């Protein structure tokens, strides 16, 4: 389901069984957004149509926002899956430090939406930590943790590069 200018939500009757499935589901939207941004950028280079440059940057910005490591955004789900696969206490500390940093940044720059998302995400992190004993999700192994982190960084880097390239 897509709500224009707000976001989308994917629902399925199938239950997620592993943290890897959570990572893949969470990062596929922004990854395909990266592919679309690259296509628009190439189209801009070939045709000099400025609308394509605008679409590339707009799409990249939307997907970068979605990849902020804040729950309930996709970046938060990736971070949660990696952090809680390492160790639940390490995961809680990592997520709490990220939330604290985000709250500081949102206060410093006056970003109310970011602060709101952090508040929602902090509540979800707390409940995830409390439910960790009941969780049936299989954790990521070391290889999947590395692949997930690299996939995330490459996607964020690619989207950032598109914005930088259009700005040149």
Regions found by a protein language model. Give the residues of each.
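Hydrophobic transmembrane alpha-helices and their immediate loop junctions
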Residues: 1-168
